[in-house]
């Protein structure tokens, strides 16, 4: 059975967020067009996503040396392993995020750190790092109040660019986007911009 992870990094729901509205439309259409697939929603703002901190680094070091971990170290290391295992079990990933300060919310970076693990999602070879997620698909749905796809602002856009780069690093061969932008720059076009993203999400879900 094909499994899709719907990974949202937004504190608002579809009523308050253009990206979440497009994401919900995508998931509804995907379920309709792929009834035998499993879809799981991971709401990063309501999940325990440990930061890679001193406890984690120390815990990983103790595991390599066969030493005993503290309860705090063990709890965080175990949780990170659960996150990674769940990610690896899936076949497709849909990330939903807003643009915050030219990037995306920090909870998404914490999640990416949790799944970017040497020996699991990539490996080191004599020729350099090699991604291991060679049979996966990714979609990123991101909303931006201004215009960052083209023009001078494109150079400072760091959210979708980073996600695309890290997924390529991990070996993902298929990366697609639904970019919703300009609704703050041109508020009179807000409904038009939102409607276009909803239509795009519904259509893309049919073949994703």
Swiss-Prot record:
InterPro entries reported in the protein's UniProt record: Flavodoxin_fold, Flavoprotein-like_sf, FMN-dep_NADH:Q_OxRdtase_AzoR1, NADH:quinone_OxRdtase_FMN_depd
Binding site for FMN: 17-19, 99-102, 143-146
Record's keyword terms, sorted: Flavoprotein, FMN, NAD, Oxidoreductase
Cofactor note: Binds 1 FMN per subunit.
The UniProt record lists the keyword NAD: yes
Gene3D superfamilies named among the record's database cross-references: 3.40.50.360
UniProt entry tagged with the keyword Oxidoreductase: yes
Pfam families: Flavodoxin_2 (PF02525)
Assigned EC number: 1.6.5.-, 1.7.1.17
Co-factor requirement: FMN
Root EC class: oxidoreductase
One MF term in the entry's GO annotations: oxidoreductase activity, acting on NAD(P)H, quinone or similar compound as acceptor
UniProt catalytic activity: 2 a quinone + NADH + H(+) = 2 a 1,4-benzosemiquinone + NAD(+); N,N-dimethyl-1,4-phenylenediamine + anthranilate + 2 NAD(+) = 2-(4-dimethylaminophenyl)diazenylbenzoate + 2 NADH + 2 H(+)
Family as reported in the entry's similarity comment: Belongs to the azoreductase type 1 family.
Binding partners and assembly: Homodimer.
NCBIfam families to which the protein is assigned, alphabetical: PRK13556.1
Its job: Quinone reductase that provides resistance to thiol-specific stress caused by electrophilic quinones.
Protein name: FMN-dependent NADH:quinone oxidoreductase
């Amino acid at each position: 059975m094909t499994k899709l992870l719907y990974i949202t990094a937004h504190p608002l729901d579809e009523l308050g967020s253009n990206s979440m509205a497009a994401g919900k439309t995508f998931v509804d259409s995907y379920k309709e067009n792929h009834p035998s697939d499993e879809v799981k929603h991971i709401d990063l703002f309501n999940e325990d996503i440990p930061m890679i901190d001193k406890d984690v680094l120390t815990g990983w070091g103790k595991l390599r040396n066969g030493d005993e971990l503290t309860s705090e170290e063990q709890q965080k290391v175990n949780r990170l392993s659960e996150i990674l295992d769940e990610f690896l079990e899936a076949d497709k990933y849909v990330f939903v995020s807003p643009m915050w300060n030219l990037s995306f919310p920090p909870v998404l970076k914490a999640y990416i750190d949790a799944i970017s693990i040497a020996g699991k999602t990539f490996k080191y070879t004599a020729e350099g790092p090699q991604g291991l997620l060679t049979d996966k698909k990714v979609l990123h749905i991101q909303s931006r109040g201004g215009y960052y796809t083209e023009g001078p602002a494109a150079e400072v856009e760091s959210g979708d660019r980073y996600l695309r780069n890290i997924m390529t690093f991990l070996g993902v061969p298929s990366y697609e986007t639904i970019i919703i932008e300009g609704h703050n720059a041109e508020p009179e076009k807000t409904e038009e911009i939102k409607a276009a993203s909803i239509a795009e999400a519904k259509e893309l879900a049919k073949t994703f």
